[in-house]
Amino acid sequence: MTQMTFSDRAVMAELVAKMLWEIKAVHFSADKPYKLASGMASPVYIDCRKLISYPRVRSTVMDFAASLIMRDAGFEQFDCVAGGETAGIPFAAFLAERLNLPMIYVRKQPKGHGRNSQIEGHMPDGARVLVIEDLTTAGGSMFTFIDAIRAAGGIVDHGMALFYYGIFPEAEARFANGKVRLHHIATWRNVLAVAKEQKLFDDKTLEEVEAFLNAPLAWSGRNGGVAELATK
């Protein structure tokens, strides 16, 4: 297992936000909003998958993830780490290596041929599984994987997102109702704070981004997107 250092949570969040800007994983576009998978219009977009291409950044982020899990969940609370298809798979491998745990990955749907598996790798019945994704918005995709693991006999009480939107009350309710504790390193508030500090955008763009973070569904509805999220 990798030797862990337990940095201050706020420092980790700030550093991850800075690294995401440095590798150009973050994009602001208030005048031409992005369309998210949920149907929302958003002035912000983030591609955490880029982390896998920057070894020094990737290593630091995964060290932070491992230290957060051990500090907040415990050292002996998991039997394996699961990544969701597809973005979560490499991060599950990186985290499993650091925690010295086996790894599995979960398909969005059974593969439809052969043994029709949805879970790949070995997961004993009753295994305590930590699910990791690169990011989560309102928790919907993570629960696709959590539900599959539970249906196969695994136990999931914790989830890990390297980046968490942190702006939807629906997400808090979903994790609470699903009896899963979500751990995360950075949020959009951390990213916006770095953008302001480093003056990366003009004031109007930053104001629009802040307006979105304060009332995302209202902003989406005004800009051609959905004004409410699906409950499932």
UniProtKB/Swiss-Prot annotation:
GO terms for biological process: 'de novo' UMP biosynthetic process; pyrimidine nucleobase biosynthetic process. Pathway: Pyrimidine metabolism; UMP biosynthesis via de novo pathway; UMP from orotate: step 1/2. Orotate binds at T137. Coiled coil: none annotated. Gene3D superfamilies: 3.40.50.2020. Its cofactor is Mg(2+). It is an enzyme of class 2 (transferase). The keyword Transferase applies. Keywords: Glycosyltransferase, Magnesium, Pyrimidine biosynthesis, Transferase. GO terms for molecular function: magnesium ion binding; orotate phosphoribosyltransferase activity. The keyword Transferase applies. 5-phospho-alpha-D-ribose 1-diphosphate binds at R107, K108, K111, H113, E133, D134, L135, T136, T137, A138, G139, G140, S141. It catalyses: orotidine 5'-phosphate + diphosphate = orotate + 5-phospho-alpha-D-ribose 1-diphosphate. Its EC number is 2.4.2.10. SUPFAM superfamilies: PRTase-like (SSF53271). Signal peptide: none annotated. Belongs to the purine/pyrimidine phosphoribosyltransferase family. PyrE subfamily. NCBIfam families: PRK00455.1-3, pyrE. Homodimer. Catalyzes the transfer of a ribosyl phosphate group from 5-phosphoribose 1-diphosphate to orotate, leading to the formation of orotidine monophosphate (OMP). PANTHER family: OROTATE PHOSPHORIBOSYLTRANSFERASE (PTHR19278), URIDINE 5'-MONOPHOSPHATE SYNTHASE (PTHR19278:SF9). This is Orotate phosphoribosyltransferase. It comes from Rhizobium rhizogenes (strain K84 / ATCC BAA-868).
